[in-house]
UniProtKB/Swiss-Prot annotation:
InterPro entries in the cross-refs: Ig-like_dom, Ig-like_dom_sf, Ig-like_fold, Ig_sub, Ig_V-set, IgHV
Species per Swiss-Prot/TrEMBL record: Heterodontus francisci
Cross-referenced SUPFAM superfamilies: Immunoglobulin
Organs and tissues of expression: Expressed mainly in lymphoid tissues including spleen, epigonal organ and circulating lymphocytes.
Any single GO BP term: adaptive immune response
Protein name: IgW heavy chain V region W26
GO cellular component, as recorded: extracellular region; immunoglobulin complex
Keywords: Adaptive immunity, Disulfide bond, Immunity, Immunoglobulin
Statement: the UniProt record of this protein carries the keyword Disulfide bond: yes
Pfam families (alphabetical): V-set
Length: 118
């Protein structure tokens, strides 16, 4: 049974960093194409990166050098430093090739970046 598990939400302040996680079960993350996308409320999906251990990690041009991708055991991560309000979005991990027709998706983490104290 293939499952991609993501935390439901996170709240951060501008200038902070955050590491988003995606823990998988039922397959080896290093043997498949793993992807991250974001969706700003009211907008479409935006591809961020694709990874496979035997290939390079490919980043969207707009975020190349800004976010960092890593893996540890059965979990993939993206770390976003110096967060901005415009980073507020739903972030999804997914397995497969041919964006956006990927076969397996995480449920997404909604990241809120706000200066308002929660």
């Amino acid at each position: 049974n293939i499952v991609l598990t993501q935390p439901e939400s996170a709240v951060k302040k501008p200038g902070e960093s955050h590491k988003l996680s995606c823990t998988v079960s039922g397959f080896d993350v290093n043997g498949h194409h793993m992807n991250w996308v974001k969706q700003v409320p009211g907008e479409g999906l935006e591809w961020l990166l694709s990874y496979r251990k035997t290939y390079n990690t490919y980043y969207a041009s707009g975020i190349q050098g800004r976010i960092t991708f890593s893996t540890e055991s059965s979990t993939t991560f993206i770390e976003i430093p110096n967060l901005r309000v415009e980073d507020t979005a739903m972030y999804y991990c997914a397995r497969g090739t041919g964006f956006p027709q990927w076969g397996y998706w995480g449920s997404g983490t909604f990241l809120t970046v706000t200066s308002v104290t929660q």
